Amino acid sequence: MNQNFTDHVAEAIQAAFAEAQRLNHTEVTENHLLWAFLKDKEGYFYSLLNGLGTNPQKLFQETENNIHHLPTYSGGGQAPNPSRSLQSRIVDAQNIAQSWKDTYTSSDHFLISYWKNGGDPFASWKKKTTISLEKLEEQIKKIRGDRHMDSPSSESNLQALEKYCKNLTDLARQGKLDPVIGRDEEIRRTMQVLCRRTKNNPMLIGDPGVGKTAIAEGLAQRIVQQDIPDSLKNKQLLALDMGSLIAGTKYRGEFEERLKGILQDIEKSEGQIILFIDEVHTLIGAGATDGAMDAANLLKPALARGILHCIGATTLNEYQKYIEKDAALERRFQLVLVNEPTIEDSIAILRGLRERYEIYHGVHITESAIHAAVLLSSRYITDRRLPDKAIDLIDESASLIRMQLGSRPLPIDNKERELAGLIVEQEAMKRESTPLAKNEVEKLEGRIAQIKEELKILREQWDQEKKIIESLKEKKDKLEKLRFEEEAAERKADYNRVAELRYNLIPQLQKEIEEAQTQLNNKPNRLLQEEVDESLIAQIVSKWTGIPVHKMLEGEAERLLHLENELEKRVVGQEIAVSAVSEAIRRSRSGLSDPNRPMGVFLFLGPTGVGKTELAKALAFQLFNQDEALIRLDMSEYMEKHTVSKLIGSPPGYIGYEEGGQLTEALRRRPYAVVLFDEIEKAHPDVFNILLQVFDDGRLTDSKGRVVNCKNALFIMTSNIGSDLLLEKMEQNKQGLAKDEIMLVLDPVIKKHFRPEFINRLDDILPFVPLREHDMEKIVVIQLNLLAKRLKDRDVELMWTPQALAHLAKEGYDPHFGARPLKRYIQQEVINQLSTAILEGKIPPHSHIKLELEGNTIRFKSFAGGKN
């Protein structure tokens, strides 16, 4: 027997033998083979019968019935032999293949053989159809074209466009594509390139998420609506699926054959097909194994001759990396730049998509949610592009509401938990026989009955609200279908149906939706929330970015107005610095500062221990509600030239290149942060060169060429240069100095240490004055409050007398070293005593401790269980 079968036929024969053996049949008949052909619903045999308008599924069932009634044998393990009917069927199919000048016998040869002289059940099934042999052969020739079965995989490459492409025009006709809002200029430019005589292949280039694929979908929708030039009318726009094209290509040459099949089908269409290739850079190297040609080289001749109309889409980085290197491929495409839409355009895009997301999730998306999604994503999610990031926010917020709609409302959940607890308590009380227990049982019964009644009312309300929401979802779904039907009727010029839909059915349904929405909104104390609003959008943004939700909405203005008060709770005696920093943050948040510069750039100058680093920490907490928002870089680590590259990452070829820079990576992950350069005077001069572009343009390029946005960060540098001069001046003037007087002292030192271009880029140089004696008591209170907080975790309350407070402030004061000696003094005099007493068991839980001054020593008194 000639073994030249296509892969599909070989697989069918194997499946027929395997099924016969499984059923313990003595031989493999032609019906086993027919069963194997029909079992593969994606196969060529099945699709041929389907394309003729017959019912191949019914034939499959009849064939399966037939083979299950064949005689079996009891002995296992014996391989069945091919029957005479199967052998003659194979020979007949091979003769047909030979007469058609095909090298390989394929499924269609077997189908013709069955059609000519197949036995039951095929023969009886064929009689019920009205299909002639001539019609079958015509259908085969239509699918095949001028192709012959000249390789084992030839059958797989028939109808290649249907297998490896997605028809965007069909999807647009069925209303399955999202509406494309705006982008008229880009779609017009794409059509302009497609209408050219040569190089009529547009290449859509833009950042990820700006809507390149949407432009192709918009073009498909315009083709369906006939809103295009005459030369593009009735064209088919197909999207190539590279994944399915490559998948399963085990042997060399299979991939090329599939691609050749696609190109032949496109050539056969005589210019009626436009191919859209998303992520077009994947063509470079695709399918190239052991010296085989890649997809790009196979496409070049078709692109050059104008056989293939192609729209490519890729990002600028990938275009430069892959396509620009291949000059022959590059010149066959014409670039169409797709820029990120503006805030206004993004809002319009989201308005257009709102109804689709409302219908899908069964929720209501407010106008404020759309504005919040665009504005908050634009401001806080800096590493992604509009409109993609704003659409994702709306989608995730709507899915959260939908998830909540499907679960029990909190009031019902709380009541059910309370009821379960009371029932357990009642059962326990029933075991007691005392009069008090009986009285308690009666009380519990009354409370249980009351909660059951409340639960009944709540469940009824929940059911009603669920029904209204489900009804709204169904009505909105129906409205979308009616609108789609209206468009289809208008295209077919069925104006009677258009009038009925436009002036009767659609307005009536819209009125029903409005009434249901009003009924839902007017319900008092609603259990279910089906509205996506700005607060929910802000909540999702906070989950993505880690920036607290309440820091983004109305409360922010109130908080910024009182920023000084909050900062002074942690930083004492530095009114000048606190005020200047607060003003800079208010300027930035109100939108009046330069949008292309960081939020603020400050140099804090002053002696050690006066609150420079503490103010940076306090700012991080106030602005972002967490101390983790402080990116702290100790400049003593960047004193040598070779360490400077750690800020932006090692250059290519050096160890650490893949890891990125310590500053750039931290800012990429957390663009909203306070960046603290501690002891900046110790940094190598090259560090200042890097910081110049950051302070001036709010951007920093890392070693990989990625631009990091620094516009939302607050940069603080600390230094103690000139602090000895400042201390001398303060000792001479006990009343304190104004900022101008302090700067007169520090100016010469600053100019000596820092270059003019660096000083010129600072928003302000803020002097921190040495702490005065009267500041120390406030710092003692802050330190003791922190200690009290730690003791409260052990259920111990701490108090102190004014005398103890004054003594700690006096003894811990050192103008040269700031607040740090005070912290050490409290540790020695107070914390050491308390820790020893706790370990000895002298301070049990629920104690109250009072710090008192005895002579010149701090002592504590412990009052267990109550205050003194």
From Swiss-Prot:
Keywords: ATP-binding, Chaperone, Coiled coil, Cytoplasm, Nucleotide-binding, Repeat, Stress response. SMART domains: AAA, ClpB_D2-small. ATP 2 binds at G606, P607, T608, G609, V610, G611, K612, T613. Residues 159-340 are annotated as: NBD1. Residues 1-146 form the Clp R domain. Residues 82-146 are annotated as: Repeat 2. Residues 556-770 are annotated as: NBD2. Transmembrane segments: none annotated. Residues 5-70 are annotated as: Repeat 1. Residues 341-546 are annotated as: Linker. Gene3D superfamilies: 1.10.8.60, Clp, N-terminal domain (1.10.1780.10), P-loop containing nucleotide triphosphate hydrolases (3.40.50.300). Residues 391-525 form a coiled coil. One of its GO terms (cellular component) is cytoplasm. ATP 1 binds at G206, D207, P208, G209, V210, G211, K212, T213. It is found in: Cytoplasm. Residues 771-868 are annotated as: C-terminal. GO terms for biological process: cellular response to heat. SUPFAM superfamilies: Double Clp-N motif (SSF81923), P-loop containing nucleoside triphosphate hydrolases (SSF52540). The Clp repeat (R) domain probably functions as a substrate-discriminating domain, recruiting aggregated proteins to the ClpB hexamer and/or stabilizing bound proteins. The NBD2 domain is responsible for oligomerization, whereas the NBD1 domain stabilizes the hexamer probably in an ATP-dependent manner. The movement of the coiled-coil domain is essential for ClpB ability to rescue proteins from an aggregated state, probably by pulling apart large aggregated proteins, which are bound between the coiled-coils motifs of adjacent ClpB subunits in the functional hexamer. Part of a stress-induced multi-chaperone system, it is involved in the recovery of the cell from heat-induced damage, in cooperation with DnaK, DnaJ and GrpE. Acts before DnaK, in the processing of protein aggregates. Protein binding stimulates the ATPase activity; ATP hydrolysis unfolds the denatured protein aggregates, which probably helps expose new hydrophobic binding sites on the surface of ClpB-bound aggregates, contributing to the solubilization and refolding of denatured protein aggregates by DnaK. Homohexamer. The oligomerization is ATP-dependent. This is Chaperone protein ClpB. It comes from Protochlamydia amoebophila (strain UWE25).
